[in-house]
Amino acid sequence: MNLRLCSCCRHNGIVSEQGYEYCIFCESVFQKCTKVQKKSNFHVSNKLIHLRNVLRRLLSHQCSGEIISELLDIMEKNQISTDDVDANFVSSFLKANERINKKDYKLVFEIINQVKDEKLNLSTEKINEVVEIFKHLVFFCQENTPSKTINYSFFLDKIFDITSVTKNLKPQTVKNYTKNNSNQLVWENFLAHMRSKKRVTMVEDYGHEYVFVDERFSTCSLEV
């Protein structure tokens, strides 16, 4: 299979589909004819795989117990309550800790979860609900936003909140306030879209049948 050079990321990753082309590396979409089908099977599947990895990570304890103990000692020394622990606090701690090489939002979420000693409500049914909402969000972003990049920490926190998985995994705010406001606006528009959307009884799952029962969605918290 010969993959052509992508003009955006400069990798040989251009794949041709009917009516459009997309890059398997940066996921850019290029028009081949007048009408473009914006939904990319690869894009949706890739996002769902990443989501599954995030959920698995939140249910595991990969962070060293020494790191957790060190953070708890700092909190006790400075009289910081677990209620005040958020992603900004944990991220600052990780940046100052030279023993941790990989500092990503999944590690931050895991540490917050351990520090607060919270049992996440992630049963099989709840995972199905999270995946369903996330899938609708991916479709919505593809159709209604100029960028297909999704801020996982921001949107997962929103989804976890409305599905009652947890209210404690507060994402880190970025210095670019325009970006923060943009994410919030996308979320509010997505909620409005879902509230006005009639229930769909059948949606392609792009090879992720293991998430659903009888190829139908579980009850969604966004339905009104």
UniProtKB/Swiss-Prot annotation:
Q: Does the keyword Transmembrane helix apply?
A: no
InterPro entries referenced in this protein's UniProt entry, alphabetically: Poxvirus_VLTF3, VLTF-3_Zn_ribbon
Keyword list (alphabetical) reads:
Activator, Late protein, Transcription, Transcription regulation
Highest taxon of the lineage:
Viruses
What intrachain disulfides are recorded?
none
Task: Return one Gene Ontology term, BP aspect.
Answer: regulation of viral transcription
Task: Report the function annotation for this chain.
Answer: Acts with RNA polymerase to initiate transcription from late gene promoters.
Subunit architecture: Interacts with the late transcription elongation factor VLTF-4/OPG110. Interacts with the late transcription factors VLTF-1/OPG093.
So what family is this one in? Answer: Belongs to the orthopoxvirus VLTF-3/OPG127 family.
Q: What name does this protein carry?
A: Viral late gene transcription factor 3
